[in-house]
Amino acid sequence: MDAAFEHDFEEELQALATTDMASDTIRNLLNSGREPLNWEIGEGIAECLLTDELGVVWPWNENRDQKTPGASLPGADLVGFLKSGDDVMFLFGEVKTSSDTSAPPNVLFGRSGLVHQIDTLANATRVHFSLLKWLRARCTGNEFEPLYQEAATRYIHSKGRDIALAGILLRDTGVNEDDLRSRGEALVGVTQGVMRVRLDAWYLPRSVEDWGAIIKSAAA
């Protein structure tokens, strides 16, 4: 999910090995890696889709922040910048991957459901504070700093409302408009004014359980 970074990381470790024992240590370390979980693959697919569809810029791969394998980081699944003409704004989003045949699927409901999470991203200042700090630390001193500065200025001048939110549902089932119809209607009263909200359902032709093998084969 972060091929260039992982390749450089592995090459750097290999260059540090000066003895057979060191080489064995590095080999064991690299072999201890795990296959990405389905929800991690889903988040990666969502990032690619939003980049292709909207030109969203991702300044940092969040997988690099994991201290525990498979851990889901707090705050938001998607954190980046949306460019709209000459304007730049923060984009925060959540991703759900589901094989549930129900319509809507269960991943949309409850406190961990997609709609509640989008509601939180729209209105929880404490979450915005955490995400802005996280972004600033990863945009300072590089090519993303001007994007951060412009998006932060827009956020402040709009009292925290001029942002973009994305809710992405990834399915391996048949297309069903009911998956998001009622959820979209429920969000109308939650997000008002200049805030932009986008809900997308993407229906992939291969089973969720096959995604890992497909990615591994494509990378070979």
What do the PLM-derived regions correspond to, one by one?
Residues 177-191:
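Short, aromatic/basic amphipathic alpha-helical patches
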Residues 103-177:
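Acidic, metal/cofactor-coordinating or nucleic-acid-engaging core segments within structured domains
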Residues 188-220:
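Charge-rich, low-complexity intrinsically disordered segments
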Residues 95-105:
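Short beta-strand-loop-alpha-helix junction that forms the active-site gateway
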Residues 44-53:
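Amphipathic alpha-helical segments that form well-ordered structural scaffolds
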Residues 53-71:
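A short acidic/basic microdomain associated with nuclease active sites
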Residues 1-44:
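Interdomain/boundary linker segments immediately adjacent to catalytic/signaling cores
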Residues 50, 78-80, 90-97:
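Conserved catalytic cores of phosphodiester-cleaving nucleases, focusing on short active-site segments
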